[in-house]
Amino acid sequence: MPAGKIYARRLTVLAVSAALTVTGFLATAPSAQAAMPTPVSAATARTYLAALTVKAEGSTSGYSRDLFPHWITQSGACNTRETVLKRDGVNVVTDSSCAATSGSWYSEYDGATWTAASDLDIDHMVPLAEAWRSGANSWTTAQRQSFANDLTRPQLIAVTDNVNQAKGDLDPAKWLPSRTAYRCTYVRAWVQVKYYWNLSIDSAEKSALQSILNGC
């Protein structure tokens, strides 16, 4: 992927989304649940959706999760997963290695609440394999690492582990959160991430996204 194109896209997103702020690393967990960065509005998501390249989904040939290095160190002893667990939880306590030893987490996808970090996965809103089939196969390793550890866009969220596993690498034409109240947020986030990272969509994916955005 030409570096100039993706960086130009990033500048456009920054201009449109100037109100969004990056969730910072916290030395101690907040007393109330934080959240992933707020997605763009439905109106902005519809504008982004119209600008995305629509084409048949590519092949998974050559794909490996190892081509998207994660989880990388974010601050001190904390890697990306641990940072998201602290951000998304309530009263999270961590040990000296930054592993969460206690806390409470609400899974937006299914409405379940968990008190053990082992019951949670950190979901890539746009899955790594989906990104690969949508253009990330041509990225550099550095670009794929940035995508896989992106804390600035609404790309990473702590959710029930088996729900994340059921989602797998499916796009919104084939999978949506069972908690219908979250679907508008989900597709707004999906579109924002795809737009920022200059990833394509297929026709069925676009139809599913458009249908939900029209009801937001």
Report residues per predicted region.
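Domain-level detector of nuclease and nuclease-like folds
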Residues: 105-216
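Alpha-helical transmembrane segments and their juxtamembrane interfaces
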Residues: 19-20, 86, 134
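Residues that form generic nucleotide/phosphate-binding pockets
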Residues: 48-52, 66, 83-87, 131, ...
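Secretory targeting and sorting signals
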Residues: 1-35
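Secreted/periplasmic proteins that engage bacterial cell-wall peptidoglycan
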Residues: 54-128
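N-terminal module-boundary/linker segments of secreted carbohydrate-active enzymes
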Residues: 25, 32-75, 203-207
